[in-house]
């Protein structure tokens, strides 16, 4: 892969030094997206036409409408500057990973929420669900024991595709929170015209996607 023009180091060493921070952010964001997205989608379908459903749909619309860097700046302003609860700069794990993972995972959570709701509503209207209800099974068993397993099949496919999107989105989020990962290295390489690093990082992201 060659040597970095800026750092005079092999590109593989730069990848090795910074890939961990990016993957921490990506996996944490995926966990946030799955937890919030699936939870909101399931509750929205089960509580259809209630305030829970409407709130989840509003979240899904707003989540995919706002750009991630804007969401990141708003979260920094609220939780780091105004409230002072969380650090504005993310260079590690634990509390320093909360704001970046929330920022990056919001859009993916919104997508998963809409897909989960649609899939759950489709399954809940199936014949075998009506049969299970007619036999007198509890609604909790019908939803969690029968409907959810089939409703998650298309959702799991999208979760796999979202991983690549989160990895690519880490470029912007690492710049917002000054996280020392591959995304920040890519931005620095672009501004300094460090072409070997740019080529290596783009190839790395393409292979993972």
PLM region descriptions:
Residues 1, 48, 82-85, 90:
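Glycine-rich, flexible loop/turn motifs
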Residues 1-13:
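Short membrane-interfacial helix/loop motifs at transmembrane-helix boundaries
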Residues 12-20:
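Alpha-helical transmembrane segments of multi-pass membrane transporters/translocases
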Residues 19-52, 68, 90-209:
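Alpha-helical transmembrane segments of integral membrane proteins
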Residues 55:
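Acidic/polar active-site rim loop that often engages polyanionic ligands
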Residues 58-87, 103-108, 114:
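Membrane-water interface segments at the C-terminal ends of transmembrane alpha-helices
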